[in-house]
Regions:
Chain A
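Membrane-embedded alpha-helical segments of integral membrane proteins
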Residues: 193-260
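Internal/C-terminal transmembrane anchor helices
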Residues: 263-288
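N-terminal membrane topogenic signal
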Residues: 6-23, 105-111
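Transmembrane signal-anchor helices characteristic of membrane glycosylation enzymes that use polyprenol
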Residues: 15-39, 205-211, 277-283
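Soluble catalytic regions of membrane-associated enzymes that act on cell-envelope
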Residues: 283-457, 463, 472, 480-501
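Transmembrane helices and adjacent periplasmic/lumenal helix-loop junctions
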Residues: 130-134, 151-194, 204-214
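Membrane-interface micro-motifs in multi-pass membrane enzymes
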Residues: 43, 58-62, 82, 86, ...
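Membrane-interface coil-to-helix junctions
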Residues: 28-89
Length: 590, 492
């Protein structure tokens, strides 16, 4: 419990307390709860140390802000660094707005509360996975520029402020309009209309000259970049509400100062503590364990930690489509798709095995579909998805890795070299680029690399046309082209099981003989037994045999489910855990 | 670092010092290498126009520093020292090398020096200078050699005589619509058109700096106007009207297949904004595409294949080169006659382009279909129209050659080639003295010669222009905000 004593003026201790609270709350929340945001954002961009990369950000106002944000985002590779970066920026926002408050309304009892609102709303915004650090940097820089504006109001300072507005616009883009709004509100209260009018004239000239002479950008780009897209938020108006809050911030602080003339420390401290309590409550309420699990799975998936993905999903049984897709892909990578896929939820049928191409879905989400093609050995199609992603989103670690790998597998070394050159110019992926670079000069390393050589074996032996909207068709084409592709066969059988087509599973059993597989995968055995039980005798399986263990389990399953209702089966009551992880249970419950 | 040609005597002295080890400590042995150095781009033995931009290159040999002594047959000499192997010619010195040197040569003597000061002298690399200048400007579409998605597409113009480059159209200003291919009326920068696909779609006609947006698809047309060809008089544009599908290959040798399901030819009257069909008398249904006029405008060349259906194997679609006589006064066409029977050799023709003198026609020959840019085997062929004889051109490589165009004087061919990496097209220029005198092509020089090595974007449909396009991205943006003028339909 914080002890509060009545003091005539706001004290340093309270301000420090506020700053410590902002730092602690944001740091701890990001470190312990939503660190997946770091993983997500770090994996959606690639900061490249090259003039070409930097040059792109110079071509539009606000680009430098995004560039600075991207530079900082590199630190997100580590959760501690990431949390510290976010916490420092938010704390700096609070510090700057405290200074503004002190300038505008010294001894204001609501000063701490308003400054904490400023940083807490940005903290809340930052918990959206698409809200990036440059957005908070924008608010921070705007706050600093506003502070400079109000700190010295002599003629020369005013001229400097006016003449630097175009530069401020170039650096921050949209935030210049936020500054314009703040400065206007402030000057209305100060009754300094000449400066306001001059500022608006400079702003109007700035945007007109920018549009007509300098930047090849549409009006929308000049007005709203680099704000996050409104569509990223469940309430698209959130961004505009926040902007309005900051625009009217000077009014809030000036008017609140007029409410109560003398400083009341209790009011001051309790009000800002209330903001923190409310923020903490919202943060905890908004926290989604499911989302956190999906990104943890994705992190393991990107690290190719297949066993980690499998065990995690089997433990937490996440119902999210992406989680199930990663689980199935990880199983396929480990050659266990038809042995283990029913050990975790399968709620989406074949959708959780493959994601069909759709130009209506944002590449950001669609991109995950690439792994099906890469896993199955349709390297050209995997390359296409990675390339489409690069075209629409720019380079990010996953698409560039896949571009390099697919080109190496296909023997397109000169193209691979281009991407490797890019990867070499990054901070965290230099070493990986070095590994790929060594493959360029020594293709034997490609043949000896377990991941790449395996893909090369799975590739089609002859050409066919990819069916982009119906990925299942491609499995058949691939199997025709390369009958030895066990992974394609497993995918085919998995799809048939998910579609509950046991008869077709049985009809395809003989294809197992075309592969190196000398045993029937567990779930396929289960499908075969079910078929035998429901429809009749199995075809000749030559050397393949159904194991006694599966036969025994089937017998147990029949016995257990014979005397219980369908609802009880669905609820899983009275069913042994091992029997819930079977194709029979999937058939009964889906 | 450049030591320029202020005084030839001093330059020779410096070069002599370099050779004798005067510049470096160490034993200073000079060994003569009995081959040319590897340079990027490969400019060895190319024929260049007397008004081309500096042919900067980088040396792909081991060495801590390099020295290039450049000698021209007009007696000019420059010396360039480089620490990173990149040889950049100063513009003024380069111009002096070219001035009055038509028909002559430029030889570059290269020396590499290693860490210990040992020097290697290579056989000189030579450029041949043609008598004929090249058109001063080039335009191209710059985009990712992608599949379905696009974000950044620009049409840029570049001065062939320097490195000056600027945007003509930028899809950032066109609501990120797709910018399709552009087409000029006889290399005229004041008269060209471009299709835009998307929310501000239409065909944009640029005349001087005035840009108008038109909707050429009339209700009578099943499909939109696609591949254009300006009639030399500038009054008409022939278009193919195509239904195009795109598919992707599973095999590593191929990427994309772009196929027509149906296509026919139409002619657009630019002044009257009226579209008219090119009559088809044949009972057999054909797909007709890639129109091209002869320089006098009395022949319409195009590619023609038997019409297929959805179930047809794309590999079976083969296009012949065909032409029809055109009578402008009566707006009537003659009967189709086959100019090059590609089907008989199990090949397919695309992109016919007639030389300005009307004697030659260059086309792309490939295995099937009409969209050769994704066909590794696509090569340029030169057809002597009067002799009816076509031959594979010496300018080809193992990768795709396509999208060729002639300079206005007919002495230079500009084409895209994917020879550097198999994926990204680069603009190559080749001297065309006559049918049997074609120079080794060179890639359009860049200020940074390593640009092509790291650039992932592709140079699409490079075209020569006799000057700079006066219209700019903002003109197109303004035009996009106006309603498209709808074309009418008339059957002659």
């Amino acid at each position: 419990m914080i002890k509060i004593s009545d003091q005539p003026v706001e004290g340093k201790t309270d301000r420090y307390l506020l700053l410590i609270l902002v730092f602690a709350l944001s740091g701890i929340y990001f470190l312990l709860f939503v660190n997946y945001i770091f993983f997500y954002q770090e994996n959606r961009m690639l900061f490249i140390y090259s003039w070409e990369y930097s040059g792109r950000f110079f071509s539009k106002p606000g680009g430098l802000l995004e560039y600075a944000g991207n530079f900082l985002t590199q630190g997100y590779i580590n959760n501690i660094y990431g949390s510290v970066i976010v916490a420092i920026v938010l704390t700096a926002v609070a510090a700057v707005f405290l200074k503004i408050n002190k300038k505008l309304s010294p001894g204001n009892s609501f000063s701490l509360m308003l400054a904490s609102v400023a940083s807490c709303v940005l903290l809340l915004m930052h918990t959206n996975i698409n809200y990036r650090i440059h957005n908070n940097l924008g608010f921070l820089i705007t706050g600093i520029w506003f502070l400079i504006t109000i700190s010295n109001e002599n003629k020369i300072s005013r001229i400097i402020i006016l003449s630097f507005f175009p530069v401020f616009f170039f650096v921050t883009g949209t935030y210049a309009w936020l500054y314009l709004g703040m400065a206007t509100i402030y000057n209305i209260f100060r009754k300094n209309l000449i400066f306001t009018v001059l500022l608006w004239i400079v702003a109007a000239f700035t945007i007109l000259i920018s549009k007509m002479l300098i930047f090849l950008q549409p009006w929308t780009g000049l007005i709203s970049y680099p704000l996050p897209a409104a569509g990223y938020f469940s309430r698209p108006s959130s961004v505009w509400i926040i902007l309005l809050f900051f625009v009217f911030y000077p009014a809030f602080i000036i008017l609140s100062g007029k409410l109560k003339m003398s400083y009341n420390r209790n009011l001051s401290v309790y009000s800002f503590l209330a903001v923190f309590i409310l923020t903490t409550f919202i943060l905890l309420k908004n926290y989604s364990r499911d989302t956190s699990q999906v990104f943890r799975l994705e992190k393991m998936f990107f690290a190719r930690d297949w066993d980690g993905v499998i065990n995690y999903q089997e433990t937490y049984r996440n119902r999210n489509l992406v989680a199930q897709y990663y689980y199935n892909t990880a199983l396929a990578e480990r050659g266990m798709l038809c042995d283990r896929m029913f050990s975790a939820p399968q709620d989406y049928g074949t959708m959780s095995v493959m994601i069909p191409w759709s130009s209506q879905i944002s590449m950001n989400r669609l991109f995950r579909g690439v792994y099906f093609y890469y896993t199955i050995g349709l390297v050209n199609e995997a390359h296409r998805w990675a390339f489409e992603s690069m075209v629409t989103e720019g380079f990010h670690p996953e698409n560039i890795k896949l571009l390099i790998k697919t080109n190496l597998i296909n023997g397109h070394y000169k193209i691979a070299e281009k991407y490797i050159t890019v990867l070499k110019k990054t901070l965290h992926y230099k070493r990986l680029a070095g590994k790929f670079e060594s493959m360029l000069s020594n293709p034997e390393l490609i043949r000896s690399d377990p991941e790449l050589s395996e893909r090369a074996k799975l590739k089609p032996q002859d050409n066919f046309v990819i069916t982009i909207r119906n990925p299942e068709t491609n499995i058949n084409s691939l199997l025709q082209s390369n009958p030895g592709n066990i992974r394609a066969l497993e995918y085919k059988l998995a799809c048939l099981m998910l579609d509950k087509k046991s008869d077709e599973v049985v009809n395809n059993l003989s294809n197992l003989l075309d592969t190196d597989n000398q045993r029937i995968p567990r779930h396929i055995e289960e499908a075969a037994l079910f078929y035998q039980f429901a429809s009749g005798p199995l075809p000749d399986l030559a050397l393949l045999r159904i194991s006694g263990e599966t036969i025994s389990r089937f017998s147990d399953y029949i016995k257990l489910t014979k005397n219980i209702s369908r609802d009880q089966i669905r609820q899983g009551s009275g069913i042994r855990e091992d029997l819930k992880k079977t194709y029979w249970y999937y058939l009964d419950t889906r | 670092m450049i030591k320029k040609n202020a005084d030839p005597v001093i330059m020779i002295l410096i070069f002599g010092l370099f050779l004798s080890g005067g510049c470096k400590s160490g034993n200073g042995n000079l060994s003569e290498i009995d081959r040319e150095p590897v340079i990027e781009p490969d400019y060895s033995g190319v024929t260049i126009p007397p008004n081309i931009a500096p042919m900067n290159f980088s040396i792909k040999e081991e060495g801590k520093s390099f020295l290039a002594e450049v000698l021209s047959s007009n007696g000019q000499r420059i010396l360039i020292k480089s620490g990173n192997g990149i040889i950049r010619f100063p513009m003024r010195s380069w111009k002096k090398l070219l001035e009055g040197n038509q028909g002559g040569a430029i030889n570059i003597h290269l020396i590499s020096i290693d860490n210990k000061g040992a020097r290697k002298k290579y056989k000189p690399v030579g450029f041949f200078l043609a008598d004929d200048p090249v058109d001063p400007w080039i335009s191209y579409r710059l985009l990712y050699p992608g599949y379905e998605s696009y974000l950044e597409i620009v049409i840029r113009q570049r001065r062939a005589e320097s490195f000056r480059e600027c945007s003509v159209i930028d899809n950032h200003l066109l609501k990120t619509n797709c910018i399709n291919c552009h087409s000029f009326c006889q290399n005229d920068p004041d008269k060209f058109l471009v299709h835009i696909r998307g929310s501000v779609g239409g065909t944009y006609f640029s005349e001087g700096s005035k840009v108008v947006r038109r909707d050429l698809k009339t209700p009578e047309m099943k499909y939109g106007a696609v591949y254009p060809a300006w009639h030399p008089g500038g009054k008409f544009v022939a278009f193919s009207s195509n239904s195009i599908v795109q598919s992707f290959h599973a095999s590593q040798e191929y990427n994309i297949e772009v196929t027509d399901l149906a296509s026919s030819l139409v002619v657009y009257d630019v002044e009257r904004n009226i579209m008219s069909p090119v009559p088809e008398e044949d009972t057999v249904k054909y797909m007709e595409t890639f129109p091209e006029w002869s320089p006098e405008g009395n022949w319409l060349y195009y590619c023609r294949a038997l019409e297929t259906d959805d179930s047809s194997d794309f590999r079976s679609i083969k296009y012949d080169l065909v032409r029809k006589a055109f009578h402008q006064e009566t707006f009537s066409f003659g009967k189709a006659e086959i100019v090059f029977d590609a089907l008989s050799i199990d090949k397919s023709v695309s992109f016919p382009r007639v030389s300005p003198d009307g004697r030659y026609l260059v086309f792309t020959l490939h295995n099937n279909g009409n969209f050769s840019i994704w066909h590794k085997e696509a090569d340029l062929y030169l057809l002597d129209i009067s002799a009816g004889k076509a031959e594979r051109m010496s300018v080809n490589s193992d990768e795709t050659e396509s999208y060729h165009s002639w300079s206005s004087n007919g002495k230079w061919l500009l084409f895209s080639s994917k020879r550097t990496d198999g994926l990204t097209a680069r603009p190559y220029i080749a001297y065309f003295g006559s049918g049997d005198k074609v120079g080794k092509p060179f890639v359009l020089p860049q200020k940074n010669p390593e640009l092509y090595l790291r650039m992932v974007k592709t140079f699409n449909k490079p075209e020569f222009m006799t000057g700079r396009i006066p219209a700019g991205p903002r003109d197109f943006e303004r035009a996009s905000k106006k309603e498209a003028e709808k074309a009418g339909w008339r059957i002659y």
